[in-house]
Amino acid sequence: MFRTMMRAKLHRATVTEANLNYVGSITIDEDLMDAVNIVENEKVQIVNNNNGARLETYVIKGERGSGVVCLNGAAARLVQPGDKVIIICYGLVTEEEIHTQEPKIAVLDDNNQIIEMLGAEKAGTIL
């Protein structure tokens, strides 16, 4: 049996742009993608901390070092520049892998720069 587990997360990313007229997806700074091992065209879930909206889309590489987090197409209706979002990527793991698989979590500052890398989450608050 396979289980769907969180394998990567960009925590508290700041939306830099919302582009309604772009063909769907989310554009993410390639440095951020590399930090948590998210690849282009991979499916992600986005949770908007400001309004509670949740959506799924796929990733497009953004310019390295730019800090870009841009929601494109219809998803642009669910965010505003400046909103804080959590970008989550899941993977399928076997029962044997459950206890050895560790997610990569990047906690970001207001400029989408990594301030902390985590391997596992504990209950609590990260601001």
Swiss-Prot record:
GO biological process, one term: pantothenate biosynthetic process
Annotated binding of substrate, by residue: 57, 73-75
Cofactor(s) needed for function: pyruvate
Cofactor note: Binds 1 pyruvoyl group covalently per subunit.
Pathway membership: Cofactor biosynthesis; (R)-pantothenate biosynthesis; beta-alanine from L-aspartate: step 1/1
Catalysed reactions, as listed in the record: L-aspartate + H(+) = beta-alanine + CO2
Entry's EC annotation: 4.1.1.11
Cell location: Cytoplasm
Cleavable signal peptide: none
GO annotation, cellular component aspect: cytosol
UniProt key word Lyase: yes
EC top class, as a word: lyase
GO molecular function, one term: aspartate 1-decarboxylase activity
Superkingdom, natural source: Bacteria
Entries under Pfam families matching the protein: Asp_decarbox (PF02261)
Post-translational modification note: Is synthesized initially as an inactive proenzyme, which is activated by self-cleavage at a specific serine bond to produce a beta-subunit with a hydroxyl group at its C-terminus and an alpha-subunit with a pyruvoyl group at its N-terminus.
Alphabetized UniProt keyword annotations: Autocatalytic cleavage, Cytoplasm, Decarboxylase, Lyase, Pantothenate biosynthesis, Pyruvate, Schiff base, Zymogen
Residues with the Pyruvic acid (Ser) modification: 25
Residues the record marks as active site: 25, 58
NCBIfam families referenced in this protein's UniProt entry, alphabetically: panD
Known function: Catalyzes the pyruvoyl-dependent decarboxylation of aspartate to produce beta-alanine.
Family affiliation: Belongs to the PanD family.
Subunit structure: Heterooctamer of four alpha and four beta subunits.
Name the UniProt record assigns to this protein: Aspartate 1-decarboxylase
